[in-house]
Amino acid sequence: NNSAYSEFVYGLEFARRGYVVFLCDQPKSGEAPINVNDTSRNVFDSWIDYAHSQKYIDGRVVVTGLSKGGMDLNAFLMDPEFSAKIDCAVNIVGAGGLRESTVPFGTNFCAVWAAADGVDANSFFGYDENGVDTRLYMVREILGDDSYQFGTLLGDFEDRTAVQFNTVFAVHPFCYIFKDIHSTMYNFVGQAVPTDTTLAPDDLVYPTFLLVSWICCFLFICMGALFAYMLAVAPGFSSSMAVVLPSASAIGAKKRAFRIALDLIVPFVFYPIFATLISNATWLNTVFCCTSKIGRAHV
């Protein structure tokens, strides 16, 4: 889903700026119970073990967590040794499990959160907003609430304050489709880890992505009609489906030969396209979402 690509984009953009990046996806289900004693430290310790084995990592670390991978992210933040090396933590439509006593607010990290649709932002940390450390700004976007503008960056990254950015649009399938979320997320990255690199605007990237996506969608819709056409007229299918075809005398020999040739050509021309639509969509997302070019378009 597109929220996964947004994690890759974050990782590539941070890596482009010289950071060591850990991309946490799904924790191993069944490896350990989740939230035992109100913590997630035991969910995926293998991430921490691997991180500690990399002795050359002494700082400039970014950790991301996608969906349930947010549990892995939490395990990173709760590790007393490694959390001090983390400069930025990114949770994308993530699950949590931290408690006030286990959040390492004293460490050098900042957080950008895109909360899941319909989930109380406070539930990620399991305690009331009033009980949150003053360094953490908990934000909830409520329909009809215009107390702040969509896309506004809250908190001060220079002081390493943590930020929770909650939007009703940040759902799993569509987290990284909308242009305003593109811009906002890269705004977070830019302020979390500033770079001296000059980024040239390229406004054609996003419209091109949409155009190609709509073309693929149209081709996918056409698949049903073409399949029905094949069942109705292709000789190989019509006999098994008991479809009545025009007799040879009803149409000319040339027209019949052309129709049979067309019936045979259609599957060879179109079906490989349909069969690879999913992989093509992945390729499109990789090209238009998982490169720094999309960042140059919206930073």
Please tell me what each predicted stretch does.
Residues 294-299:
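Conserved small/polar residues in nucleotide/adenosyl-binding loops
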Residues 259-272:
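Alpha-helical transmembrane segments
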Residues 231-237, 272-288:
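Membrane-helix interface motif
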